Regions:
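Basic- and aromatic-enriched surface patches that contact anionic nucleotides/nucleic acids
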Residues: 1, 87-212
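N-terminal extension/subdomain marker
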Residues: 1-89, 96-103
Length: 212
């Protein structure tokens, strides 16, 4: 479960799981003067190599810590959503910190005349807690108890070598500039989404949304 993955990361941080590198097709790009990689990975793998800097005593040696503790009720809801066929197409954002040198190796294959992005294979050391989860912790840990943690693949944007202050700034930028869907817009969208649903309860939900 989610607690087990966090425990493994805390106790065995930076220790190899095995000597075989994880190899993933990836795209290398630059954004804001920072190098990053885009790839798709099975949640179980990312849960092992990822780690969340929670604001807790266990992480006092790491500074700054910026993530709130995982919420069990929210995780349970996300797990059910995933097991019922739901999915989140937005990327998990991680950082392989400068402390973890040589954890990444990008094997370049190809580029095109239309883009400076590079296509290749990203080789990642298979070790616990080498990538900090900056955004998407609940989406990721929602897979911990899911039947799809080994078969689904989730999108990831991975930075290489952001320092702790840059990580904190990125976390703040993401959370300050994201805007939640307003209650009014949500009702309008639910009406459109469920109006012709074959499920009676969903059609009733659409009707309620149109009346409110």
């Amino acid at each position: 479960n989610a607690a087990l993955y966090q425990f493994l990361g805390l106790v065995f941080k930076n220790e190899k799981i095995n000597d075989e590198r994880i190899e993933i097709p990836a795209i290398e790009g630059d954004m804001g003067g920072k190098k990053y990689y885009m790839f798709s990975i099975e949640p179980d793998l990312l849960l092992k190599i990822g780690f969340v800097l929670h604001r807790a005593k266990a992480n006092e040696s790491e500074f700054p810590t910026y993530q709130r503790l995982l919420q069990p009720a929210r995780l349970k809801g996300i797990t059910k959503f995933i097991n019922d066929g739901g999915y989140f197409p937005n990327s998990i954002i991680v950082n392989f910190s400068g402390k973890n040198k040589n954890k990444l190796h990008f094997e370049f294959f190809k580029t095109t005349k239309n883009s400076s992005s590079k296509l290749g294979v990203l080789k990642i050391t298979n070790a616990y807690a080498i990538a900090y989860i900056i955004d998407g912790q609940h989406r990721l840990y929602g897979y911990a108890n899911s039947q799809y943690k080994d078969s689904n693949t989730i999108p990831v944007v991975a930075f290489d070598g952001l320092d702790s202050i840059e990580q904190l700034q990125l976390f703040m930028d993401i959370n300050e500039n994201q805007k939640a869907v307003s209650a009014t817009l949500r009702l309008d969208l639910e009406e459109d989404l469920y109006w012709d649903s074959p499920v009676a309860a969903s059609r009733l939900k659409a009707l309620r949304s149109s009346i409110i």
